[in-house]
Amino acid sequence: MTRLIIGLGNPGDRYFETKHNVGFMLLDKIAKRENVTFNHDKIFQADIATTFIDGEKIYLVKPTTFMNESGKAVHALMTYYGLDATDILVAYDDLDMAVGKIRFRQKGSAGGHNGIKSIVKHIGTQEFDRIKIGIGRPKGKMSVVNHVLSGFDIEDRIEIDLALDKLDKAVNVYLEEDDFDTVMRKFNG
């Protein structure tokens, strides 16, 4: 079986460690553990690394289309490999969750997240698995855009690193388990 694990973010050094890029950060952690490297694919408009986890071929995908067009890369890869929405897992930031909180979710609306909106638009369904990673709301009068495109302060970075460590393990459990409810019970928090 072939699966896509997609991390959402924005390409380039300017966005490397920003809150909006926690999906990319998770994939970087998985790639490091799996000892694989990302290569840019111009056709699919994504950085892609390939590995095998629990006997499944896994493509780690970081769309390079910028967040608002992430669905283009996801749709192109799904079409090429003959995959459907049940074959993808998408990791992304969530403003409405406290920093470092994680939640596996099977389906649902985009909740205002432009990357998820783009995926739903391009693949034609909301029925795909997700990992939401809490980045918290802006403090003070900071705009949402400035918040998601800013880095983490020291305390928040510690929480994010702990969440990414937990998710690194959780993704393996997700790939091994046949029961999504079990994964949600073990790791949502």
From Swiss-Prot:
InterPro entries recorded: Pept_tRNA_hydro, Pept_tRNA_hydro_CS, Pept_tRNA_hydro_sf
Quaternary organization: Monomer.
**What SUPFAM superfamilies does the record point to?**
Peptidyl-tRNA hydrolase-like
Q: Which organism is it from?
A: Streptococcus suis (strain 05ZYH33)
Q: Name one GO cellular component term.
A: cytoplasm
Q: What does this protein do?
A: Hydrolyzes ribosome-free peptidyl-tRNAs (with 1 or more amino acids incorporated), which drop off the ribosome during protein synthesis, or as a result of ribosome stalling. Catalyzes the release of premature peptidyl moieties from peptidyl-tRNA molecules trapped in stalled 50S ribosomal subunits, and thus maintains levels of free tRNAs and 50S ribosomes.
Which Gene Ontology terms describe the biological processes this protein takes part in? protein quality control for misfolded or incompletely synthesized proteins; rescue of stalled ribosome
Q: Where is this site: Stabilizes the basic form of H active site to accept a proton?
A: 93
This one is known as: Peptidyl-tRNA hydrolase
Q: What is its EC number?
A: 3.1.1.29
Family membership? Belongs to the PTH family.
Q: What one GO molecular function would you report for this record?
A: peptidyl-tRNA hydrolase activity
Keywords of the record = Cytoplasm, Hydrolase, RNA-binding, tRNA-binding
What are the binding positions for tRNA in this chain?
15, 66, 68, 114
Compartment annotation: Cytoplasm
What HAMAP family does this protein's entry cite? Pept_tRNA_hydro_bact
Cited NCBIfam families? pth
Marked site, Discriminates between blocked and unblocked aminoacyl-tRNA, at: 10
